[in-house]
Amino acid sequence: MAMYQNMLVVIDPNQDDQPALRRAVYLHQRIGGKIKAFLPIYDFSYEMTTLLSPDERTAMRQGVISQRTAWIHEQAKYYLNAGVPIEIKVVWHNRPFEAIIQEVISGGHDLVLKMAHQHDRLEAVIFTPTDWHLLRKCPSPVWMVKDQPWPEGGKALVAVNLASEEPYHNALNEKLVKETIELAEQVNHTEVHLVGAYPVTPINIAIELPEFDPSVYNDAIRGQHLLAMKALRQKFGINENMTHVEKGLPEEVIPDLAEHLQAGIVVLGTVGRTGISAAFLGNTAEQVIDHLRCDLLVIKPDQYQTPVELDDEEDD
């Protein structure tokens, strides 16, 4: 069965060009499925109009929602006229990330696409607070779309964790590879590469233990990672030349390799840890994301549960 058959596109309210919608249509043309163009809006000034009755406030909100709905319809007109099934939904909500995740849950959406803004000079992608909330808390995969065309022959680079002895990391590695291969086969037979980073010898160990041999330690760590990568690639029938085990910090290794390969997308897993307030993306993942210059797909483990709940009832 084809993946991503119920896509939610987060519309950027500040520009007419919508790269995330364009990417969703690109996927639709190759794998089918439905698209919902979704925009949460809020204007505090409308809440300050104490002279208005609740009915008048509701009417004002509804007027803004109608205006924005018509505006999105105009953005999507070309696709709609071409027969692409796009539903448009605008809601009034003062926390955009909550509105998006609630829509994902209530609508059963299996992929969220959102535009990632770029720093003009650095070309690096800049993530907003809403982006980070989605990457940390959205139960469905989140695809951050860079405002550039998909590179010709763009590859998919899957970042895997080869060091951990935790069983959930193995399951997540396999999920990342499996889903990326499935998607790649359906979208232009995209080439899939795997990357794992391993740490360099801590300098303080070499200083404190004179008999410690850094080269032996490095060889052992590298060997461990190579064996783990071999097992993973063999499970999915991936050629050795499509796998990369590199020495260094993940936040340097992964973006550098993505650039070297001219990757169109980096696929990354994040592990949810309940009880650790909003910090469960993990420093490593966040630093990797901060250095990327291409699209990003973030996937959670199967057992992940979002801390965001559906509202009991609509606000007045």
From Swiss-Prot:
GO terms for molecular function: small molecule binding. This is Universal stress protein E. InterPro entries: UspA. Induction: During growth inhibition caused by the exhaustion of any of a variety of nutrients (carbon, nitrogen, phosphate, sulfate, required amino acid) or by the presence of a variety of toxic agents. Positively regulated by guanosine 3',5'-bisphosphate (ppGpp) and by a RecA/FtsK-dependent regulatory pathway. It is found in: Cytoplasm. It comes from Escherichia coli (strain K12). It holds the Pfam family Usp. Its main location: cytoplasm. PANTHER family: UNIVERSAL STRESS PROTEIN E. Belongs to the universal stress protein A family. Required for resistance to DNA-damaging agents. GO terms for biological process: bacterial-type flagellum-dependent cell motility; cellular response to hydrogen peroxide; cellular response to UV; response to stress; single-species biofilm formation. The gene is uspE. GO terms for cellular component: cytoplasm. It comes from the Bacteria. Keywords: Cytoplasm.
